[in-house]
Amino acid sequence: MTTVNYETDVVAWANEQAWLVRNKKFELLDIEHIAEEIEDVGKSEQRELASRMAVLIAHLLKWQFQPEYRGASWERTIKEQRKSLEFHIKQVPSLKSKLSNSEWQGAVWADAVTIAIKETAIENFPETCPWTVENILSHNWLPTSA
């Protein structure tokens, strides 16, 4: 039994759980909440990957469909997202499998299109992503004008 309530102060609870583990007081651990927190770490990593990929794809859409507005800001965002995605996948190699998952790709594409529509007022983007994951992540590739 823990002395700090998970529901009222998760930071104090986490510190207490860490202390219990380090002091081998396993019988006092809040196993159910620890398991939830461990699962949430993985979900958080997946959300970050999807979010960064959606922002990258949205900017690639803007680059392709609004060539007259291309500028250093868009190019910088594209480069930053690619670099961040590359770093993130190196830090969490198991995330790489998401990149080839068609269901995940579809969800990311839908998010990217939503972002692009909000930022451009263009509503006739392709139904599915016209680019390969390799192109999207390539530091040397940008889509050509539509």
Predicted regions and their residues:
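Surface/interface-facing alpha-helical segments and adjacent flexible terminal/loop regions used
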Residues: 1-146
